[in-house]
């Protein structure tokens, strides 16, 4: 039998064929090199032509592949299976705010209060819960998909939406304090992350005044529909989160069983005199949550004043759809000042318990003012001398470092000024 013919070489070398150029051979060259390879002093390689299609007799090729050599074992191994990553797992705001994967210190000294990563400087502080209390919680905590992203995902199935709502419900349940054995650092970090997501969503998503500021009645026939839309309402979400914040502060101030109330040693640090169960990181996270709450309310009030000034049509829609109110049998006319006063009263009702539990100075409060003539002992978290000094010092440092941006005091003054403007609406 005649030996099989060797495959013919290509006319062009590999280099010219890759660049899709005409390959011109140098006459009488010892290695039959082309002009370009000879000028660049590179080896001119011309691979053999590969026949398209399948081999003529694949059965004959199988015995040859039964005993592969060690050099070809790696080539004959099957490729690894592809990993399917669900799209919805990459569309959550938790993935955007995954600060725990950065492996760096949580630098918050130069970050303004109204930013998403608001917090306090942590240099030179030995905390029991470490810096992780100011960032995202451990990966065992289930991440949630915010509701405003679910409204955008129109192609999401019903089962996927149910799973997202179930995860959100699980995280909301973790925010509920249970007894004295809860991890306050974990709950505070969850609360801080939830407030950060709400502020980000409020500043990045469109704001519909006809839905956010809609006035409804308990006996209204459409009350059930309004309750369904409440989870997409920024005002309803911050009201619920503020109530959870106040409940968490109340559980923190609950006396510890077996403490006796006054078992603080003389050599105890000022931090232990504020609260023995909280680290410095926890106190800073509490102040960060308070400033984030004020920033959210300030953003809502700013949106309301902007809509009331430049979009009177939306205000008329809200007032016309409001139920009829009667005072002493006299119908109350629906006007803009009534809507603005209701918003201010609702905000004061949400902020008052938080400010009382924190025990902040009057200049840092929006709704609660300390009674100067009362001699009762203040029971707020920062009502003591050490707490007042710590709070004032941190606020002053943050205001100075913020520069032109709104620091902690700037957020408070901005919200106070916006409330004054709303009261002047006519």
From Swiss-Prot:
Industrial or biotech use: Calbistrin A has been reported to possess a number of interesting bioactivities including antifungal active against Candida albicans and cytotoxic toward both healthy and leukemic human cells.
Induction conditions: Expression is induced in complex medium (Czapek yeast autolysate medium) supporting calbistrin production.
Top-level taxon of origin: Eukaryota
Keywords from the named record: DNA-binding, Metal-binding, Nucleus, Transcription, Transcription regulation, Zinc
InterPro entries to which the protein is assigned, alphabetical: Zn2-C6_fun-type_DNA-bd_sf, Zn2Cys6_DnaBD
GO molecular function: DNA binding; DNA-binding transcription factor activity, RNA polymerase II-specific; zinc ion binding
Pfam family, one: Zn_clus
Phenotype upon loss of function: Abolishes the production of calbistrin and of the related metabolites decumbenones, whereas production of unrelated compounds, such as andrastin C, remains unaffected. Results in a significant down-regulation of the expression of the calbistrin biosynthesis cluster genes calA, calB and calF.
Disulfide bonds: none
Primary location recorded for the protein, binned into one broad class: nucleus
DNA-binding residue intervals: 13-44
SUPFAM superfamilies from the UniProt entry: Zn2/Cys6 DNA-binding domain (SSF57701)
Keyword tRNA processing belongs to the record: no
UniProt subcellular location: Nucleus
GO cellular component: nucleus
Region of interest (Disordered), residue spans: 46-82
Function: Transcription activator that specifically regulates the expression of the gene cluster that mediates the biosynthesis of calbistrins and related compounds such as decumbenones. Calbistrin A is a secondary metabolite with an interesting structure that was recently found to have bioactivity against leukemia cells. It consists of two polyketides linked by an ester bond: a bicyclic decalin containing polyketide and a linear 12 carbon dioic acid structure.
This protein's name: Transcriptional regulator calC
Origin organism lineage: Eukaryota, Fungi, Dikarya, Ascomycota, Pezizomycotina
């Amino acid at each position: 039998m005649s030996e099989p013919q060797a495959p013919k070489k290509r006319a062009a070398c590999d280099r010219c064929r890759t660049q899709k150029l005409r390959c011109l051979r140098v006459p009488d060259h010892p290695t039959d090199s082309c002009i370009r390879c000879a000028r660049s002093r590179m080896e001119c390689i011309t691979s053999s032509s590969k026949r398209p299609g399948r081999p003529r007799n694949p059965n004959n090729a199988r015995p040859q592949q039964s005993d592969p050599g060690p050099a070809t074992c790696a080539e004959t191994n099957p490729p690894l299976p592809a990993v399917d990553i669900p799209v919805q797992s990459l569309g959550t705001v938790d993935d955007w705010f995954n600060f725990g994967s950065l492996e760096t210190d949580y630098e918050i000294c130069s970050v303004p209060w109204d930013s998403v990563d608001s917090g306090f400087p942590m240099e030179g502080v030995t905390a029991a819960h470490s810096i992780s209390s100011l960032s995202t919680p451990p990966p065992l905590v289930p991440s949630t998909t915010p509701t405003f992203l679910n409204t955008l995902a129109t192609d999401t199935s019903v089962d996927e939406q149910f799973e997202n709502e179930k995860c959100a419900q699980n995280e909301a349940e973790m925010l509920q304090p249970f007894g004295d054995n809860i991890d306050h650092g974990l709950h505070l970090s969850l609360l801080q992350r939830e407030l950060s997501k709400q502020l980000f969503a409020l500043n990045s998503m469109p704001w519909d005044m006809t839905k956010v500021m809609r006035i409804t009645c308990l006996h209204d026939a459409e009350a059930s529909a309004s309750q369904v839309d409440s989870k997409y309402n920024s005002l309803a979400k911050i009201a619920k989160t503020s109530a959870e914040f106040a409940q968490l502060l109340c559980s923190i101030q609950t006396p510890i069983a077996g403490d006796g109330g006054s078992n603080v040693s003389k050599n105890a640090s000022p931090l232990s005199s504020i609260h023995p169960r909280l680290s410095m990181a926890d106190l800073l996270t509490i102040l960060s949550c308070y400033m984030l709450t004020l920033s959210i309310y300030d953003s809502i009030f700013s949106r309301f004043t902007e809509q009331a000034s430049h979009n009177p049509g939306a205000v008329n829609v809200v007032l016309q759809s409001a139920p009829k109110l009667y005072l002493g049998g006299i119908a109350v006319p629906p006007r803009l000042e009534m809507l603005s006063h209701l918003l201010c009263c609702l905000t004061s009702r949400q902020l008052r318990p938080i400010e009382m539990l924190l025990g902040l100075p009057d200049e840092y409060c929006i709704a609660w003012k300390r009674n100067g003539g009362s001699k009762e002992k203040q029971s707020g978290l920062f009502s003591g001398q050490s707490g007042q000094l710590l709070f004032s010092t941190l606020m002053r440092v943050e205001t100075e470092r913020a520069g032109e941006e709104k620091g902690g005091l700037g957020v408070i003054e901005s919200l106070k000024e916006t409330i004054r403007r709303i009261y002047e609406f006519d």
